[in-house]
């Protein structure tokens, strides 16, 4: 079973030592709003690209960690 975009974001946040609040601040949105988007897996492609940039990942249709090359 593959992970949702929201689940992938949570995995990468953990590996980056970041919190949801950190990501919300860096993407200029409230933590509750971002939390809702993650739980509902409701993102636009533009939002996913911005999140990937903040997390130092490449966004294709998957997340790929730039430093390890691991696809999540």
Residue ranges and their predicted role:
Residues 56-72:
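Short C-terminal boundary/hinge segments that cap the last helix of small helical domains
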């Amino acid at each position: 079973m593959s992970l949702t975009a929201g689940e992938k974001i949570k995995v990468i946040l953990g590996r980056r030592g970041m919190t949801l609040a950190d990501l919300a601040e860096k993407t200029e949105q409230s933590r509750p709003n971002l939390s809702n988007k993650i739980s509902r897996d409701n993102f636009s492609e533009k939002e996913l690209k911005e999140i990937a940039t903040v997390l130092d990942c490449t966004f294709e249709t998957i997340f790929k960690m730039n430093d390890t090359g691991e696809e999540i």
